[in-house]
Design a protein with these regions (language model features):
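Short, aromatic-enriched amphipathic alpha-helices that serve as compact interaction elements
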Residues: 1-18
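A solvent-exposed, acidic/Ser-Thr-rich amphipathic alpha-helical stretch
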Residues: 27-72
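Hydrophobic pocket/interface hotspot
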Residues: 10, 22-23, 30, 49, ...
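Soluble or luminal CAZymes and related metallo-dependent hydrolases
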Residues: 2, 52, 91
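A beta-strand edge to alpha-helix "cap/lid" segment located at domain peripheries
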Residues: 55-113
């Protein structure tokens, strides 16, 4: 799988609220580092491992009662996507960047700003 395809699947999982499919995009030891939460006064989220990613999104989608509203998705290039996401009613501009994929096309590290 190429990076652009992985980004498209990431956005689809975020929009549908599918924590299992989202976690399946990550390597067993994959890292998700999200500093976009600072924009709404929350701490940076750093997750290591596919299981941690799945559990966190299961929790987030549950508390949110479904997927996070995402709009205005723009692919900046094959490794980065920009979008607006609503965190509890607050609209935030976010960039998600895949820093590295493994040999199987799974995410080794994704940074969200």
């Amino acid at each position: 799988m190429n990076t652009r395809t992985v980004l498209e699947k990431y956005i689809a999982c975020m929009q549908s609220g599918d924590n299992v499919a989202l976690a399946d995009l990550f390597d067993k030891h994959g890292v998700l580092h999200d500093s976009s939460l600072i924009k709404i006064g929350r701490d940076t989220m750093h997750l290591e491992g596919k299981m941690a990613i799945e559990m966190m999104f299961h929790n987030k989608f549950g508390f949110n009662r479904g997927a996070f509203p995402i709009s205005a998705v723009k692919y900046r290039n094959d490794t980065a996507v920009w979008y607006f996401i609503s965190y509890g009613g607050q609209l935030v501009s976010v960039s998600a960047v895949i820093e590295e994929l493994n040999e199987e096309g799974l995410i080794k590290r994704m940074n969200i700003y």
